[in-house]
Amino acid sequence: MIHKLLIAYDGSDSAKAAFDLALDLAGKYGAELHVLAVARPPEFGAEVETEAVIESSRRHYTHLLQPLKTRAAGLTAHFEVMVGHPAEGIVLYAEDHGIDHIVVGHRGHGLFERWLLGSVARQVIAYTRCTVTVVRG
């Protein structure tokens, strides 16, 4: 049984497919839906530039989530934008909010790129305590 469902959303094709699945699951189980977008902070730059980039990222993701709110009408849904490393943000959000199921998209990177960089989906699976469903885009 799913009570609290988290969808990690970045606007990619796989995230859109993951959101569709999360909507279906939330409706089927009467689960509370949490939609989280995690913007990466810049890795370099002056403090003023960094703050401007972070604020721009927040606005971008807030705008990106807006159409999803309409699609989630009728469900108990929460939308949040945070700044940080995506996998870490997803895992911490899940722990803080008692999430029992996470849905994430997975982009089809090549084998070398997956080995070298890892993936957000892989890191979420490795570090969370709840069930994770990965949707390929």
Identify the function of each model-found stretch.
Residues 1, 29-32, 76, 98:
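Short loop/turn motifs at secondary-structure junctions
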Residues 3-48, 55:
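Small/aliphatic-rich secondary-structure junction motif
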Residues 23, 66, 122:
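Active-site phosphate/pyrophosphate- and oxyanion-stabilizing loops and adjacent acidic/basic residues
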Residues 34-36, 78-82, 133:
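General small-molecule cofactor/ligand-binding pocket signal
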Residues 42-43, 89, 111:
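Generic structural signal for helix capping and beta-alpha/helix-loop junctions
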Residues 51-63:
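A short acidic, glycine-rich active-site loop
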Residues 70-102:
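Structural beta-alpha unit
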